Amino acid sequence: MKILISAVGTTDPISNNHDAALLHIARNYRPDKIVLVYSQEMMVKQDLINKVLLSIEGYNPIIEIDSTILNNDEVFLFDKMYEVMGQIVQKYTNDDNEIILNLSSGTPQIISALFALNRINDYNTQAIQVATPKNRANREYTALTESEIDALIMENQDNRLDFVDRSIKDKSEKFTQALVKRHLRSLIASFDYQAAEAIINRKEYNKLLSKKKIAYIREKLYDFSRVFKNQSILSDILSFPLDDSQKKALNYYLMIDVLKEREHIADVLIKAKSLAEFVIEETIKKDHEGLIVFDGNLPKLNPSFPDCEAILDDIDKKMKKSRGIEDTEERIFSVQSTLNLLSYLNILEFYEYDSQLQTAINGILSLNGERNKVAHGLSEIDTRLLSRKKLKQLSENLRLLLVDCLGIDSSYFNYYDKQNKELIKMLE
């Protein structure tokens, strides 16, 4: 539905034998509904406005008077009008409505408020201004004579020492809050939780929302920020019905996915391999208990494990083939060698694990060259080799590992998207 929201001004509906702004917009855009916002002073115009709007030939809109009546002593306060008009626009805003705002009727403060709302908030709106018939100010200025100027000064009742100060210092609190909320929504939508946390924690924004809402958002952003600062596990994940390995892996994957969205490619490459190694290591430890032992933090094959020699031979053979030294008799891979993602893949191949799982690991390993440049050198990432499509595939490969190896339900993977929607909704 197309809805026109308009204040009723002193010149509406007809001025100097021409449409005033409200009538002209209705005539041109023919909205399905016209929502009229009256001030106390303009309420006397109700019958006149309705009759003139319905006089447009072939047009019979729904005319609705909004329940909010603007106080005469507030229509010249920008921040108040920003708050009130914002509430009115919000009331009629949804995915099915196209909103038209009249930027030419009402006090300058009402017009400015609607202009700001159109620019700042993410509403489906278009704002319309209407020029006067002569394309200039409504009241023409006639030059005064010297005597008329002198009389004007003399008759000015404010031109004395005891004049009444009618100026109002507008702090624009609501307008400022709207700007801050918009900025916070933008930061959260781009997953920049640390920047959003730094802003919302400022004391001057304690009244940005209700105490309950501001405390909730601050707690969430603090929790999210800890993940990227310290690799802490999300509070929500700690409460999920998962074991410790599943919680660690899910938390790490979600962190990688956010880094991918923020295009922190170097971090994604380094962390993706680490996560894959962790998941496969946990899988092998569970399925073949005792095969892997640790020398400090370094994983190695257990020489006492029944299949150890056969696995060593298989890995050694594949390593020699990859290096083109098949004829070398001496082993280049032994029980002293530290296991990594490639050797874990070889173990999965030895035990004939699912081919789809092996394909996913190979996909992660295919980016290992770029990963090593970042992790072990100061090389620039070749973005030609790392398109968004490849990074998306990398994320999908990691998801497959988490689902197939650790049994993590895929419904957890959109955690941050769900949280973002909730926080953004609260900041509207």
Curated annotation (Swiss-Prot):
GO MF terms, alphabetically ordered: endonuclease activity; nucleotide binding; RNA binding
EC number(s) stated in the UniProt entry for this protein: 3.1.-.-
Signal sequence region: none
One BP term from GO: defense response to virus
Region named CARF domain: 1-145
Region (HEPN domain): 146-428
SS bond list: none
Gene3D superfamilies linked to this entry: Hypothetical protein VC1899 like domain (Restriction endonuclease-like)
InterPro entries membership: CRISPR-assoc_prot_Csm6, Csm6_CARF, Csm6_HEPN
UniProt KW keywords: Antiviral defense, Endonuclease, Hydrolase, Nuclease, Nucleotide-binding, RNA-binding
EC class: hydrolase
Activity: how regulated: Non-specific ssRNase activity is allosterically activated about 1000-fold by cyclic hexaadenylate (cA6), a second messenger produced by Cas10 of the ternary Csm effector complex in the presence of a cognate target RNA. ssRNase activity is inhibited by physiological concentrations of ATP (1 mM), activity is restored by cOA.
UniProt note: domains: The N-terminal CRISPR-associated Rossman fold (CARF) probably binds the cA6 effector. ssRNase activity resides in the C-terminal HEPN domain.
Misc. remarks from the entry: Encoded in a type III-A CRISPR locus.
Role, per record: CRISPR (clustered regularly interspaced short palindromic repeat) is an adaptive immune system that provides protection against mobile genetic elements (viruses, transposable elements and conjugative plasmids). CRISPR clusters contain spacers, sequences complementary to antecedent mobile elements, and target invading nucleic acids. CRISPR clusters are transcribed and processed into CRISPR RNA (crRNA). The type III-A Csm complex binds crRNA and acts as a crRNA-guided RNase, DNase and cyclic oligoadenylate synthase; binding of target RNA cognate to the crRNA is required for all activities. Csm functions as a non-specific ssDNase. Base-pairing between crRNA and target RNA to form a ternary Csm complex activates a ssDNase activity; target RNA cleavage suppresses the ssDNase, a temporal control that prevents uncontrolled DNA degradation. Viral RNA transcripts probably tether the Csm complex to the viral genome, recruiting Cas10 ssDNA activity which is able to degrade DNA in the transcription bubble, spatially controlling the DNase activity.
Family statement drawn from the similarity comment of this UniProt entry: Belongs to the CRISPR-associated Csm6 family.
NCBIfam families (alphabetical): cas_csm6
Subunit structure: Homodimer. The composite ssRNase active site is formed at the dimer interface.
Protein name: CRISPR system endoribonuclease Csm6
UniProt source species: Streptococcus thermophilus
Name of the encoding gene: csm6
